[in-house]
């Protein structure tokens, strides 16, 4: 969510003519992230987020925006795309597709506890089940084919030890993806990027018996149809780790995974390949962070993430992965 494309006051005024959102009160760029240009937008009607899509095309975008509308209609708290005056969910700004969505309440919890992981686990399972009847289909664009295409461009910049790990894990994942067990894993629309900074929490209402309340999931622009277990693995690799070492926090991981299973129990194939999928989740972000670090795009406000973080996580997952926790009952 960096700003690659600047938007002037006159640009914004022209753009807002296509919306019935009142007068603009405030507008500012969001500096975090590395994929799209995002801006907080406040009008007399409410708070919104304007996104200019730097890589996604007009042909790809309906999958993401319609998915958000679908999930919202099924009770999953996500940003709701705002239609333009012609009914479309996006238009063109500076020659690139752009959209406005509602801004969720709450703030990110960057030091989550067990209670936050429980909320995230339950809602992630609800998201997966809610997407079962979503009519559009688009693969996760940062999966195996993307890794195979981009790893060769990264290799010249890294050490021999890193190259051995990068190429060895790619071969391992290619074999896993080609297996019958992989084909049997449950799949559907996935967030694919459910990090701590893509989830908001608000204060729980008095008398509810809860300390935290999930405000919602956002930044769906890496979403795609993938194995649900991959989505769980990506989430656990961020929400349930020691940030300094990449080691799993067993208490948080256990809480998130048990909460997920109260909504959707894991299959036998998922249990067998939990280690493989945790490795896949770590590998995906190590590759993308290496690529963004060594082959960056120019941007006004760009803060590339440390690729070493997911290298440490990948090495940890190869060395140590506890089994998925068992539960006795499940409810819907």
Curated annotation (Swiss-Prot):
HAMAP family: Homoser_kinase_2
Catalyzed reactions: L-homoserine + ATP = O-phospho-L-homoserine + ADP + H(+)
SUPFAM superfamilies: Protein kinase-like (PK-like)
Pathway assignment: Amino-acid biosynthesis; L-threonine biosynthesis; L-threonine from L-aspartate: step 4/5
Keywords: Amino-acid biosynthesis, ATP-binding, Kinase, Nucleotide-binding, Threonine biosynthesis, Transferase
Gene3D superfamilies: 3.90.1200.10, Phosphorylase Kinase, domain 1
Example GO BP: threonine biosynthetic process
Coiled-coil positions: none
GO molecular function: ATP binding; homoserine kinase activity
Protein name: Homoserine kinase
Family, similarity comment: Belongs to the pseudomonas-type ThrB family.
Record-linked NCBIfam families: PRK05231.1 (NF003558), thrB_alt (TIGR00938)
EC number(s) on file: 2.7.1.39
Organism this protein belongs to: Burkholderia cenocepacia (strain ATCC BAA-245 / DSM 16553 / LMG 16656 / NCTC 13227 / J2315 / CF5610)
């Amino acid at each position: 969510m960096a700003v690659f494309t600047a938007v002037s006051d006159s640009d914004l005024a022209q753009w807002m003519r296509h919306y019935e959102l009142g007068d603009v009160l405030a507008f500012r760029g969001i500096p975090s992230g590395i994929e799209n240009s995002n801006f907080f937008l406040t009008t007399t009607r409410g708070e919104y987020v304007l996104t200019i899509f730097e890589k996604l095309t007009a042909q790809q975008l309906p999958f993401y925006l319609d998915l958000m509308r679908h999930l919202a209609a099924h009770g999953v708290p996500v940003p709701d795309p705002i239609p333009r005056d012609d009914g479309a969910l996006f238009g063109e700004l500076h020659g690139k597709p752009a959209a406005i969505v509602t801004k969720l309440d709450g703030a990110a919890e960057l030091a989550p506890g067990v209670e936050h992981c429980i909320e995230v686990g339950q809602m992630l399972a609800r998201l997966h089940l809610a997407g079962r009847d979503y009519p559009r289909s688009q693969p996760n664009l940062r999966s195996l084919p993307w890794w195979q295409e981009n790893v060769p461009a990264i290799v010249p910049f890294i050490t021999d030890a890193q190259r051995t790990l990068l190429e060895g894990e790619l071969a391992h994942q290619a074999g896993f993806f080609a297996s019958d067990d992989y084909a049997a894993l449950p799949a559907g629309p996935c967030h694919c990027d459910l990090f701590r900074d893509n989830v908001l929490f608000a204060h729980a209402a008095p008398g509810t018996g809860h300390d935290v309340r999930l405000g919602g999931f956002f930044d769906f622009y890496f979403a795609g149809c993938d194995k649900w277990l991959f989505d769980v693995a990506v989430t656990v690799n961020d929400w349930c780790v020691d940030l300094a070492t990449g080691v799993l926090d067993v208490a948080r991981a256990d809480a998130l995974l048990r909460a997920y299973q109260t909504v959707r129990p894991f299959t036998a194939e998922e249990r067998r390949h939990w280690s493989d999928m945790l490795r896949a989740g770590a590998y995906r972000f190590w590759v993308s962070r290496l690529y963004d670090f060594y082959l960056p795009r120019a941007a006004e406000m760009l803060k590339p993430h440390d690729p070493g973080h997911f290298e440490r996580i990948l090495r940890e997952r190869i060395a140590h992965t506890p089994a998925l926790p068992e539960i006795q009952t499940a409810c819907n």
